[in-house]
């Protein structure tokens, strides 16, 4: 339903306001527990079980891929009237890491540069997902239209420096003790999303 509404909204000849997005933010919990329950007292739309850090990174990449596909893969302009000069975000998932990620498999941090390298190594055809296209290409190419994680890193650093920010992805981590939102962003022309994607307007961010 969400993907269909995004496509229809982006292709509507009479403007985006006629067609409403039917997208809902999903609450996702990632756990290393063997049982069904994630955090006690909390309700989630889906629970993902992992055994180690490689599985965890792969599942995060799959979530990003599903979000990217759901919102039109950066090819569909679904922004409302009046937002064309701004970044317009759609929140796909609210991701919670169960305490077992730290306690059972000892993961306290996930390096963002390592995550980019996993995107480079993992192919779309090698994951189990009903929505991600079956293609013999890496997630890095799917997201950024490049084959080198170093190229993505360099582009991010350059974009940050142009905005007066010193960036070093070696020191950027996802920490399981925090919650994260997974979003896509429609960006105005000239943004870092366009630089990385060879012309696309969006980006999958966690």
Label each residue range with its predicted role.
Residues 1-206:
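Long, compositionally biased, intrinsically disordered regions
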């Amino acid at each position: 339903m969400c993907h269909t509404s995004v496509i229809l909204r982006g292709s509507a000849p009479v403007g985006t306001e006629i067609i409403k997005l039917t997208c809902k933010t999903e609450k996702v919990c990632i756990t290393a527990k063997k049982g069904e329950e994630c955090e006690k007292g909390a309700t989630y739309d889906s629970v993902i079980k992992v055994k180690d850090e490689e599985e965890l990174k792969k599942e995060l990449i799959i979530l990003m891929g599903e979000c990217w596909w759901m919102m039109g893969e950066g090819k569909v302009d679904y922004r409302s009237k009046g937002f064309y000069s701004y970044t317009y975000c759609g929140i796909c998932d609210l991701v919670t890491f169960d305490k077992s990620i730290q306690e059972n498999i000892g993961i306290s941090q996930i390096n963002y540069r390592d995550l980019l390298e996993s995107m480079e190594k993992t192919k779309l055809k090698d994951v189990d997902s009903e929505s991600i296209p079956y293609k013999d290409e890496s997630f890095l190419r799917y997201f950024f239209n490049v084959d080198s994680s170093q190229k993505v890193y360099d582009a991010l650093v350059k974009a940050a420096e142009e905005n007066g920010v010193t960036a070093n992805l070696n020191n950027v981590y996802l920490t399981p003790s925090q919650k994260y939102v997974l979003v896509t962003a429609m960006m105005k022309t000239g943004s870092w999303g366009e630089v990385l994607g060879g012309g696309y307007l969006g980006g999958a961010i966690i």
